[in-house]
From Swiss-Prot:
Encoding gene, per UniProt annotation: rpsZ
Transmembrane segments: none
Biological process, per Gene Ontology: translation
Protein name per UniProt: Small ribosomal subunit protein uS14
InterPro entries (alphabetical): Ribosomal_uS14, Ribosomal_uS14_bact, Ribosomal_uS14_CS, Ribosomal_uS14_sf
Pfam families in alphabetical order: Ribosomal_S14
Amino acid sequence: MARKALIVKQQKPQKYKTREYNRCKICGRPRAYLRKFGMCRLCFRKYAHQGMIPGVKKASW
């Protein structure tokens, strides 16, 4: 889990646009962020397995 201080710090408007970065909306993780879903890969995998993300299913070929 991300530290609360870092999450709050990131939410404040930055002086320069390049300092902004994406965080997972669920756990606050800054790495492995999936833009299309707005969450990190770990939360994506968890919710996809539970069937909570519409249109996502496990690949099989």
